């Protein structure tokens, strides 16, 4: 019984430290917001080209890799961060609220310039 108790304690401690390490590896909220704003902008630009689906997908992947490189983010870091924020829905809601606000502001500025 004592052995099982200590084994349980060790598992709990290791899982907590693993979670903390994961949290240290994820992108900060502001980094995530900036990245997602740019990513959605790229996605919109690719869709507006009206290319065949396979060509659009290839172009999007290339542009996404360029964005990752430009922002100095590894793809695994982005995907891990995105997954982490999906598990923390209140934070993801705040992130996407900021993304939508930023994209709306960009859109209104572009419309003003076009007028």
Model-derived features with residue positions:
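Bacterial signal peptide processing site
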Residues: 17-19
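Short functional linear motifs
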Residues: 6, 32-33, 78
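Compact alpha-helical subdomains of small soluble proteins
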Residues: 50-115
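Sec-dependent signal peptide recognition
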Residues: 2-9
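Short hydrophobic/aromatic-rich motifs at helix boundaries and adjacent loops
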Residues: 4, 35-39, 51
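C-terminal motif of bacterial Sec signal peptides marking the signal peptidase cleavage site
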Residues: 13-15
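Post-signal peptide N-terminal segment of mature Sec-exported envelope proteins
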Residues: 25-46
């Amino acid at each position: 019984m004592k052995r099982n108790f200590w084994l349980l304690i060790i598992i709990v401690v290791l899982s907590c430290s693993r979670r903390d390490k994961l949290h240290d590896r994820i992108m900060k909220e502001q980094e995530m917001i900036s990245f997602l704003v740019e990513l959605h902008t790229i996605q919109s630009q690719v869709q507006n080209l009206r290319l065949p689906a396979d060509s659009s997908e290839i172009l999007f992947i290339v542009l996404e890799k360029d964005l990752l490189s430009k922002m100095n983010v590894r793809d695994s870091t982005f995907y891990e961060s995105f997954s982490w924020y999906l598990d923390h829905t209140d934070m993801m809601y705040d992130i996407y609220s900021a993304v939508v606000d930023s994209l709306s502001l960009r859109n209104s500025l572009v419309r003003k310039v076009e007028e």
